[in-house]
């Protein structure tokens, strides 16, 4: 929702302040395939293994999202 940086539905998430729905100090992310322990995973980290003739999808190092590269192997 507007103004939220993270999903504050679960107080168990160590990256997100459940009271404010904001990332905790020092956290870059709270969830996502490219988020590990509140930090963006390194560029090139495989976040989705290829199926068929597609190449693996990899993290950008700048986001918690795992973008589809759309490239054939």
UniProtKB/Swiss-Prot annotation:
Q: In which tissues is it expressed?
A: Expressed by the venom gland.
The reply on keyword Disulfide bond is: yes
Q: Which UniProt keywords apply?
A: Cell adhesion impairing toxin, Disulfide bond, Hemostasis impairing toxin, Platelet aggregation inhibiting toxin, Secreted, Toxin
The terms describing its cellular component in GO are: extracellular region; plasma membrane
Q: Where, per UniProt, does this protein localize? A: Secreted
Segments carrying motif Cell attachment site: 51-53
Question: Annotated Gene Ontology MF terms?
Answer: toxin activity
The chain's disulfide connectivity reads: 6-21, 8-16, 15-38, 29-35, 34-59, 47-66
- For the keyword Cell wall biogenesis/degradation, the answer is no
Q: Which InterPro entries match?
A: Disintegrin_CS, Disintegrin_dom, Disintegrin_dom_sf
Domain (Disintegrin): residue spans on this chain: 1-73
Sequence similarity? Belongs to the venom metalloproteinase (M12B) family. P-II subfamily. P-IIa sub-subfamily.
Subunit (UniProt) = Monomer (disintegrin).
| Record's function text | Inhibits fibrinogen interaction with platelets. Acts by binding to alpha-IIb/beta-3 (ITGA2B/ITGB3) on the platelet surface and inhibits aggregation induced by ADP, thrombin, platelet-activating factor and collagen.
Q: What else is known?
A: The disintegrin belongs to the medium disintegrin subfamily.
Name the record gives this protein: Disintegrin tergeminin
Q: Which organism is it from?
A: Sistrurus tergeminus (Western massasauga)
List the top taxonomic levels of the source: Eukaryota, Metazoa, Chordata, Craniata, Vertebrata
